[in-house]
Swiss-Prot record:
Intervals, Extracellular compartment: 19-23
Function: Adapter protein containing an immunoreceptor tyrosine-based activation motif (ITAM) that transduces activation signals from various immunoreceptors. As a component of the high-affinity immunoglobulin E (IgE) receptor, mediates allergic inflammatory signaling in mast cells. As a constitutive component of interleukin-3 receptor complex, selectively mediates interleukin 4/IL4 production by basophils priming T-cells toward effector T-helper 2 subset. Associates with pattern recognition receptors CLEC4D and CLEC4E to form a functional signaling complex in myeloid cells.
The protein's assembly and partners: IgE Fc receptor is a tetramer of an alpha chain, a beta chain, and two disulfide linked gamma chains. Associates with FCGR1A; forms a functional signaling complex. The signaling subunit of immunoglobulin gamma (IgG) Fc receptor complex. As a homodimer or a heterodimer of CD247 and FCER1G, associates with the ligand binding subunit FCGR3A to form a functional receptor complex. Associates with CLEC6A. Interacts with CLEC4E. Interacts (via ITAM domain) with SYK (via SH2 domains); activates SYK, enabling integrin-mediated activation of neutrophils and macrophages.
Species assigned in the record: Macaca fascicularis
A Pfam family matched in the record: TCR_zetazeta
Protein name: High affinity immunoglobulin epsilon receptor subunit gamma
């Protein structure tokens, strides 16, 4: 019971100390704001790079729209029908 009361009092004291220095909160808010902007920019940059890489790899691959080419070897061979001797 006593440790719970002491813990509650410590939490209340910490809240009162945090309210006494609003300038520190403003500084921390500014740091978090800049951190969020930097992370957002890095995320957007990464998405753009991935999209450009996907487009480049799609253009390099043999896609559906590439032209047809002739084959050197025939697919089917002709059968040589020999008559059996009579």
């Amino acid at each position: 019971m006593i440790p719970a009361v002491v813990l509650l009092l410590l939490l209340l004291v910490e809240q009162a100390a945090a309210l006494g220095e609003p300038q520190l909160c403003y500084i921390l808010d500014a740091i978090l704001f800049l951190y969020g902007i930097v992370l957002t920019l890095l995320y957007c940059r990464l998405k753009i790079q991935v999209r450009k890489a996907a487009i480049a790899s799609y253009e390099k691959s043999d896609g559906v729209y590439t032209g047809l080419s002739t084959r050197n070897q025939e697919t089917y061979e002709t059968l040589k029908h020999e008559k059996p001797p009579q």
